């Protein structure tokens, strides 16, 4: 497994783009993905979750994930990455837990969730406070639709996975080998 840690330089990343294969990676941002055309496979840990038009996937901070596209047709999605601090009252959940099943099907999603996502995607200027408000609308509507489990329950027992997860979650802390 080739894994990368992506340092998110921008406070907010929001774009609609053609979906493609993205190798396993992790970052300390909350990632929201909404399929707008075609299909997308979102891999979290060792599980692969199929997503269709209108489905929304959530990757909480410091969770190894990847994307795959198997369809021959063009697939597009809205991708939003924000610091977990943007989650407001949901911040502790974003940092300490992960969705057991990270995809919410289109039929379960209220229209204001799509409106909030589109508002973020269509912003001409980066307005963090406005983005934060929209992210909290999305979370308020969606987080109750997901069963949350401790992050240690998501992923793999594989030594490499566990090592990378530990290092990524603790690399800023001081430590000693004494």
Question: What name fits each language-model region?
Answer:
Residues 1-56, 71:
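Generic protein-terminus/edge-of-domain signal
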Residues 1-16, 57, 61-126, 136-148:
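A hydrophobic/aromatic-rich effector-binding and dimerization subdomain
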Residues 31, 108, 130, 162, ...:
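Amphipathic alpha-helical recognition patches that constitute DNA-binding helices
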Residues 109, 123-131, 152, 156, ...:
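Residue-level recognition of alpha-helical structural elements
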């Amino acid at each position: 497994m080739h894994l990368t840690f992506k340092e998110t330089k921008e406070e907010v990343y929001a774009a609609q783009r053609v979906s493609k294969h993205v190798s396993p990676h992790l970052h300390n941002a909350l990632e929201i993905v909404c399929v707008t055309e075609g299909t997308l496979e979102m891999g979290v840990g060792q599980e692969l979750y199929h997503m269709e038009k209108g489905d929304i996937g959530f990757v909480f901070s410091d969770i190894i994930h990847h994307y795959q596209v198997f369809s021959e047709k063009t697939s597009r999605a809205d991708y939003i990455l924000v610091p977990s601090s943007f989650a407001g009252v949901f911040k502790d959940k974003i940092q300490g837990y992960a969705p057991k099943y990270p995809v919410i099907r289109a039929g379960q999603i209220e229209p204001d969730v799509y409106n909030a996502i589109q508002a973020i995607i269509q912003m001409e200027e980066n307005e963090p406070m406005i983005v934060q408000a929209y992210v909290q609308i999305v979370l308020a509507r969606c987080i109750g639709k997901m069963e949350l489990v401790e992050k240690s329950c998501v992923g793999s027992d594989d030594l490499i996975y566990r090592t990378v997860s530990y290092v990524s979650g603790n690399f800023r802390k001081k430590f000693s080998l004494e």
